[in-house]
Amino acid sequence: YGSAGWGFWNHSMVFDISMPIWFIHLKSRGPYMLQGFFAQVKNHLYPVKLYGPSLSALSLVSRLTRGRLGVVIHSGKPALQDLDLTQWHVYRVEWREGAVSFYVDGRHVATLPLRGQEYRARADVWIDNAVFGYNRRDAGRVYRHLTQENRVRAYLEVDYVKVT
């Protein structure tokens, strides 16, 4: 339980400047709306695989309210629901001016907007025992860790990373 992922990040948890451009896997015990594997740019998410119910209603509300829920979910339907995350895959992130495209094994799974400030980020690969919560009234205006207890070892194996 927790999060794992790979991509690019500017290493900030502050709402207004946090800039992840990555694939992220989120799994939590208990109520957490984002249970699955997603492509993400800033607070924009596209589901690749879901572990819970459809996100169709949440997707519609998040788009109509322009992210007031903390995220904008671009589709309620996952791009590759049958994806087996226990197998090896080739993931690609194409970061271009105005948009980022995501691919799994050469299949396009999402394109998300990239707007606003100038973006600088480092390559980032991680596995963590936390998912992240958004509360727009948070005094520090940061995403908070929602720590998950894990009683078994977890692994994230990476064969290679190529940045061009």
Question: Language-model segments: which ranges?
Answer:
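Ligand-recognition surfaces built from glycine- and aromatic
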Residues: E118-T164
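Extracellular/lumenal carbohydrate-interaction signature centered on repeated Trp-anchored short motifs
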Residues: L80-Q87
